[in-house]
């Protein structure tokens, strides 16, 4: 990630399969990667806008042991995303956990936002000759998130959460993209 963020797509060549490296080079040239500075500002802005009411983060997924108060105080005092994470991180609460907690709060993921197990199989790519195996799945399976979203209440909740995260990611790219790109994403078939 560090090599990629420093703007050197060629530096990651030894770490990715040779056959797909042209896709990485193309994505880098098009700005289809995260601008972490923009992502931090966007996340902090979402957290600040959610910082209303008596316990604004009380229902966030993963909140326990008074973390909602710690998160609220950190959001109110921080001017950068790194300051926010520094204020949240302790020996007891590692930075990775606090990063996930802050993102869940920014995206509005409540404890009951998701079912305990994935309600569908979102097919991103595969081999055409393997598609018949999907007929034996007990879960709905499709490349279309719009179709999966219509497969029941649990699927709709999960798809909306997936769309929120994808839209956040699309906004925080070096070359930002419009909302809903995940709904227009094409399946990749290998031959």
Predicted segments, located by residue:
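Active-site cores that bind ATP or allylic diphosphates and position pyrophosphate for catalysis
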Residues: 1-191
